[in-house]
Regions:
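A structural signal for short loop-to-beta-strand junctions that line the ligand-binding cleft
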Residues: 87-91, 109-114, 118-155
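Ligand-binding "clamshell"
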Residues: 103-111, 135-137, 230, 261-277, ...
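Mature extracytoplasmic/periplasmic domains
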Residues: 287, 292-352
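Bacterial signal peptide processing site
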Residues: 17-21
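Short beta-strand->loop
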Residues: 109-120, 172, 269-283, 292-295
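Conserved C-terminal helix/tail region of periplasmic/extracytoplasmic solute-binding proteins
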Residues: 241, 348-379
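Ligand-binding pocket segment of bilobal, Venus flytrap-like solute-binding proteins
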Residues: 186-201, 205-276
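Early extracytoplasmic/lumenal segment of secretory-pathway proteins
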Residues: 27-102, 241
């Protein structure tokens, strides 16, 4: 992440992101227990398509470790698992928006940085950003960062709108009934996550994307309700294949996932997928490796984190997932098309108009969830 982006991010996050000197509800294991004994297992719980399978296979083979993976498609699903204290996993990858309250709930063990020599490759500005919710960078090791945006099938959208000219504010495609009523027939997809979707709606109606004001949240819900009947699906992962296969013409999603959809469509001969980066701004997030409190294979967890921060590994993973890696030297090793793609590394003007998805207090999370469930149920 560039210093310009993080200067913006820090300004947005500082003072409201929840950085705290408070001790988590449950103390983490001490250094000795974090080191763990050598084992032959590693259990990962992560987003789908979030590492090149070849790198995972190579790690397992080179270290004689059996790596198992399970996948989630929303931060809410991950949070429900780790807050039980019985996740059954050694490594998870929550977003900045959720990690802070999970740390304070005592869901994670501290990271032993002495076991991660490649920690020095992490963009220092990213660490400053994460320190706003993880004081001293004790629990989280940045993995990827990216944007929440939208993508279209240009051919299908042009046919539905009767023109190939897009609105000046490209978010009109999903939030303005004038456009959604025309696009509903070819398929619109929203995030299936209030954490991700509400800030986009708040930004669109001119409110603080991280607002905790009840009236603002109600206004955002009302704005989405106006187009609810035109939304075909709510998804935080299925939109990838649906967009690639022509079952959707507009999808809100994670930038990298939308680029994966674009790549899969191109492999099938469809070159009509375009990932948009609205100049009015996008949502910015950071995902980090964290070790659950109940992790058993702790040494292997550290070993895997270190492996992913190797510039060559980080670049290979970044080329596969089409997100920006936390490893600063990796960008120079990435495919040049991706390294110069504004949907992977947004330009300065876009970053200046964007926001970081911040943690919310419990009462706001509860209200957002209530409004979200009502929206999905068309109430």
């Amino acid at each position: 992440m560039s210093k310009t982006l993080l200067a913006v991010a820090l300004a947005l996050v500082l003072g409201a992101c929840g950085g705290s000197d408070e001790t988590p509800a449950s103390a983490a294991s001490d250094t000795a227990s974090r080191s763990g004994r050598a084992t032959g297992e590693l259990n990962l719980f992560m987003w789908s398509d979030y590492a090149d399978p070849a790198t995972v296979e190579a790690f397992g083979k080179d270290n004689k470790i059996n790596v198992s993976q399970a996948f989630y498609d929303s931060n809410e699903a991950l949070e429900a698992k780790v807050l039980t204290g019985k996740s059954g996993f050694d490594l998870v990858i929550p977003s900045l928006s959720n990690a802070g309250r999970q740390i304070q709930a005592g869901a994670y063990q501290e990271i032993d940085k002495s076991q991660i020599p490649n920690y020095n490759n992490i963009d220092p500005e990213l660490l400053k950003l994460m320190a706003q919710i993880d004081t001293g960078n004790k629990y989280a090791v940045p993995y990827f960062w990216g944007i929440n945006t939208l993508a279209i099938n240009t051919q299908m959208v042009a046919k539905a709108l009767g023109t190939d000219k897009l609105p000046e504010n490209e978010w009109d495609l999903v939030f303005n009934p004038e456009y959604t009523k025309k696009l509903k027939h070819c398929g619109i997809s929203f995030f299936d996550s209030p954490t991700e979707q509400f800030p986009l709606a708040l930004k669109y109606i001119g409110k603080d994307p991280n607002s905790t004001d009840k009236a603002d949240l109600a206004a955002a819900a009302a704005a989405m309700k106006k187009v609810r009947a035109d939304v075909r699906q709510f998804s935080s992962s299925a939109y990838i294949n649906n967009l690639a296969q022509g079952e959707l013409c507009v999808a809100i999603g994670y930038g990298g996932d939308l680029n994966i959809a674009k790549r899969r469509a191109a492999e099938a001969g469809n070159t009509n997928i375009r990932v948009l980066v609205p100049k009015t701004g996008v949502g910015i997030w950071v995902d980090s490796f964290m070790i659950p409190k109940d992790a058993k294979n702790i040494a292997n967890a550290h070993k895997y984190i270190n492996y992913t921060l190797n510039p060559k590994t980080a670049a290979q993973n970044a080329d596969f997932v089409t997100y920006a890696p936390a490893s600063l030297p990796a960008r120079e090793l990435m495919d040049k098309t991706l390294a110069n793609d504004p949907s992977v590394f947004p330009d300065e003007a876009t970053k200046a108009n964007s926001y970081v998805v911040r943690p919310k207090p419990p009462e706001t999370v509860k209200l957002q969830t209530q409004l979200w469930l009502a929206l999905k149920a068309k109430r």
